[in-house]
C-alpha cells in the first residue's frame, strides 16, 4: 500500500531531520517483509527457470526469452549473490551447475566489456567471496572453486579490449574475431567501472595483469586532460578518447554514462584504503563540487534537491534519471566512511528528492527520466510540477534499482525506520504493478493507471539489485550488510554484487 505524504509534512521532515550520527544503530531481526521479498525472488526465478533458462532473460508476459547479454545466462549469474544471501541452496546449486557449463569464449553477439564485467564477472567473483566466506557451508565447498576459475576464463577472453594505444579499452568487442566496433571514444562510466572487478580478480588469483589493465585505463580519469574538461574539481567530461586517454568533452553529470565512475571512486577506497587514497581524494573533490555547483532546487519545490548537469557552454541542465538516484547512496557511503556530516546530510536530501519521484506518481514508482526546468513543463504535467517539483520526460520503469538502493543506504547509515518504509512501499508497488504470472515486467508509464501497460522483459538486475536491496533492508544483520563508518567487510559493485574488502595476506 502506498504511503502519501503531504507536501508540508515532507518539508517538515527535511527541516527537522535528526542528524545521522545521533540515531541509534539499526536493530536487525527476522522480518516477515524479508520473507515477502524472498517469495518474490523465488517467483521470478521459477518463471525464468521454467520458461527462459539458460537464456539471458525472461519475457514475463509472453513467457518467451531474450539473449541481450551474450547468450550466457545473464539472469542466472546475476541472481547468484542474492540467492546466496537468501540462503536458497536449491537455486544456488542450479546456478553453479549452469556457470560450470558456460563457454565464455563463444557467442555470436558483440560483447559489452562494461555490462559483461558488472554482471557476469562480478556475479561470479561475488559468489566466490560469499561462499568462501560468510555463506560457507551453504553448498558443497568443492563446487565453489569453479566460480573463480570461470571468472579468470572470462577475463582472459575479454582482456584484449584493453589492447589500444592508450590502454583505454573498447567497450563493444567481438570475442570471436578479436575485433571491435571501431569507436573512437569510450564513456566515462564504462571506462571507470571496471577497476573494482578486475582488481578483485587479481587479488584473488595472484595475477596482477587484470588490476594493471583496469587501473591503467582509470589513471587517465584520475589525472584528466585537458584541464578545460574538468570545469570544477573532480567533475570531468563524459567521454574519453581511446587513442590517447584524453577527455573528449566537458559534459558533466551524475546521469547514465558518467554515474558509476563517481560511484567507484569511493568504493575503491572502501575496498582498500591503502592502495586507493587518490580515488578517495577525487571522490571528495567531485562530491564537494557537486554540492557547490550542481545542487538544484525546483522553483515550485525549493525543499527538493536534485543534481543538475553542466555543459561546455557553462549552462546547467535541469534533467535527471532514475539511474542517477544512486547518488544519495554514494554521498551517504562516503559521508559515513569519512565522517563528513555535510556529505551525509546532502545524501539524505538527494534520497528525499528521489523519493519524491516515486511518491508523486499514480503507481508509486519513479520514471526513467524527469526534469524540473520551468521553461519546459508540458501543459498536461503542470499540476505535477507544481505539486512535486518535477515532470516526466520518459515514464517507463524497466525494473531499475537505484532509488531502493539509496533508501537502503539511508536506512543503514541513519537507522531511521522511515527509509525502511520507503523501501517497503517501493517494493510493494513493484509487486503490485509489475508482477505477472511468471515474473516481473516493466511499465510503460508510471504516472498512468496500472502503469500504462507492461513491457515484456525482465532485466537481470531485477534479481541482482531490486530484490537484493529490498531483502537486505529487512534481513538480519550479516557480514555483507552495509555498515556505518569504516566497518564494512564487503563493498558492492554497481550491479549490487558484494566483494570482500581487501585484507593483506
Swiss-Prot record:
Catalytic activity reads: N(4)-(alpha-D-Man-(1->2)-alpha-D-Man-(1->2)-alpha-D-Man-(1->3)-[alpha-D-Man-(1->2)-alpha-D-Man-(1->3)-[alpha-D-Man-(1->2)-alpha-D-Man-(1->6)]-alpha-D-Man-(1->6)]-beta-D-Man-(1->4)-beta-D-GlcNAc-(1->4)-beta-D-GlcNAc)-L-asparaginyl-[protein] (N-glucan mannose isomer 9A1,2,3B1,2,3) + 4 H2O = N(4)-(alpha-D-Man-(1->3)-[alpha-D-Man-(1->3)-[alpha-D-Man-(1->6)]-alpha-D-Man-(1->6)]-beta-D-Man-(1->4)-beta-D-GlcNAc-(1->4)-beta-D-GlcNAc)-L-asparaginyl-[protein] (N-glucan mannose isomer 5A1,2) + 4 beta-D-mannose; N(4)-(alpha-D-Man-(1->2)-alpha-D-Man-(1->2)-alpha-D-Man-(1->3)-[alpha-D-Man-(1->3)-[alpha-D-Man-(1->2)-alpha-D-Man-(1->6)]-alpha-D-Man-(1->6)]-beta-D-Man-(1->4)-beta-D-GlcNAc-(1->4)-beta-D-GlcNAc)-L-asparaginyl-[protein] (N-glucan mannose isomer 8A1,2,3B1,3) + 3 H2O = N(4)-(alpha-D-Man-(1->3)-[alpha-D-Man-(1->3)-[alpha-D-Man-(1->6)]-alpha-D-Man-(1->6)]-beta-D-Man-(1->4)-beta-D-GlcNAc-(1->4)-beta-D-GlcNAc)-L-asparaginyl-[protein] (N-glucan mannose isomer 5A1,2) + 3 beta-D-mannose
Species of origin: Emericella nidulans (strain FGSC A4 / ATCC 38163 / CBS 112.46 / NRRL 194 / M139)
Glycosylated positions are: 88, 174, 359
* Residues reported in the UniProt entry to bind Ca(2+): 494
Q: What is this protein called?
A: Mannosyl-oligosaccharide alpha-1,2-mannosidase 1B
Under InterPro entries, the record lists: 6hp_glycosidase-like_sf (IPR012341), Glyco_hydro_47 (IPR001382), Glycosyl_Hydrolase_47 (IPR050749), Seven-hairpin_glycosidases (IPR036026)
Source domain of life is Eukaryota
Per the UniProt entry, the signal peptide is 1-16
Q: Which gene encodes it?
A: mns1B
Any binding details for the cofactor? Answer: Ca(2+). Can also use Mg(2+), but with lower efficiency.
Question: Could you tell me which pathway this protein works in?
Answer: Protein modification; protein glycosylation
Organism placement in taxonomy:
Eukaryota, Fungi, Dikarya, Ascomycota, Pezizomycotina
Q: What family classification does the UniProt entry report for this protein?
A: Belongs to the glycosyl hydrolase 47 family.
Q: What cofactor does its activity depend on?
A: Ca(2+); Mg(2+)
Amino acid at each position: 500500500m502506498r504511503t502519501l505524504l503531504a507536501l508540508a509534512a515532507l518539508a517538515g521532515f527535511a527541516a527537522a531531520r535528526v542528524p545521522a550520527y545521533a540515531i541509534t544503530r539499526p536493530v536487525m531481526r527476522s522480518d516477515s517483509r524479508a520473507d515477502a521479498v524472498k517469495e518474490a525472488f523465488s517467483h521470478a526465478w521459477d518463471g525464468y527457470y521454467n520458461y527462459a533458462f539458460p537464456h539471458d532473460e525472461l519475457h514475463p508476459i509472453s513467457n518467451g526469452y531474450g539473449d541481450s547479454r551474450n547468450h550466457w545466462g545473464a539472469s542466472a549469474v546475476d541472481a547468484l549473490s542474492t540467492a546466496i544471501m537468501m540462503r536458497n541452496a536449491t537455486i544456488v546449486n542450479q546456478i553453479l551447475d549452469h556457470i560450470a557449463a558456460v563457454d565464455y569464449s563463444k557467442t555470436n553477439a558483440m560483447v559489452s566489456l562494461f555490462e559483461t564485467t558488472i554482471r557476469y564477472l562480478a556475479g561470479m567473483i561475488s559468489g566466490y567471496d560469499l561462499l568462501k566466506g560468510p555463506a560457507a557451508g551453504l553448498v558443497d565447498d568443492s563446487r565453489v572453486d569453479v566460480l573463480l576459475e570461470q571468472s579468470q576464463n572470462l577475463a582472459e577472453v575479454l582482456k584484449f579490449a584493453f589492447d589500444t594505444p592508450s590502454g583505454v579499452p573498447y567497450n563493444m568487442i567481438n570475442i570471436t574475431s578479436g575485433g571491435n566496433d571501431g569507436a573512437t571514444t569510450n564513456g566515462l562510466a564504462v571506462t571507470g567501472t571496471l577497476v573494482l572487478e578486475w582488481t578483485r580478480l587479481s587479488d584473488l588469483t595472484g595475477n596482477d595483469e587484470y588490476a594493471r589493465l583496469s587501473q591503467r585505463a582509470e589513471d587517465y580519469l584520475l589525472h584528466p586532460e585537458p584541464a578545460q574538461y574538468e570545469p570544477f574539481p573532480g567533475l570531468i567530461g563524459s567521454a574519453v578518447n581511446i587513442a590517447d586517454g584524453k577527455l573528449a568533452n566537458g559534459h558533466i553529470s551524475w546521469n547514465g554514462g558518467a554515474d558509476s565512475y563517481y560511484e567507484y571512486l569511493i568504493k575503491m577506497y572502501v575496498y582498500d584504503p591503502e592502495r586507493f587514497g587518490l580515488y578517495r581524494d577525487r571522490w571528495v573533490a567531485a562530491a564537494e563540487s557537486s554540492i557547490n555547483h550542481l545542487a538544484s532546487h525546483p522553483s515550485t519545490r525549493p525543499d527538493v534537491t536534485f543534481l543538475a548537469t553542466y555543459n561546455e557552454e557553462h549552462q546547467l541542465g535541469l534533467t535527471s534519471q532514475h539511474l542517477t538516484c544512486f547518488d544519495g547512496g554514494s554521498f551517504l557511503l562516503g559521508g559515513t566512511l569519512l565522517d563528513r556530516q555535510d556529505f551525509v546530510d546532502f545524501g539524505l536530501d538527494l534520497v528525499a528528492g528521489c523519493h519524491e519521484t516515486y511518491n508523486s506518481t499514480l503507481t508509486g514508482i519513479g520514471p526513467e527520466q524527469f526534469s524540473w526546468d520551468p521553461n519546459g513543463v508540458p501543459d498536461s504535467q503542470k499540476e505535477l510540477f507544481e505539486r512535486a517539483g518535477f515532470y516526466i520526460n520518459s515514464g517507463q520503469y524497466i525494473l531499475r534499482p537505484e532509488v531502493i538502493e539509496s533508501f537502503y543506504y539511508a536506512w543503514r547509515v541513519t537507522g531511521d525506520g522511515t527509509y525502511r518504509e520507503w523501501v517497503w512501499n517501493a517494493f510493494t508497488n513493484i509487486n503490485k504493478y509489475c508482477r505477472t504470472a511468471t515474473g516481473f515486467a516493466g511499465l510503460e508509464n508510471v504516472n498512468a493507471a496500472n502503469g500504462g501497460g507492461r513491457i515484456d522483459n525482465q532485466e537481470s538486475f531485477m534479481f541482482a539489485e531490486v530484490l537484493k536491496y529490498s531483502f537486505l533492508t529487512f534481513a538480519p544483520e550479516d557480514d555483507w550488510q552495509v555498515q556505518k563508518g569504516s566497518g564494512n567487510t564487503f563493498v558492492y559493485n554497481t550491479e549490487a554484487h558484494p566483494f570482500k574488502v581487501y585484507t593483506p595476506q
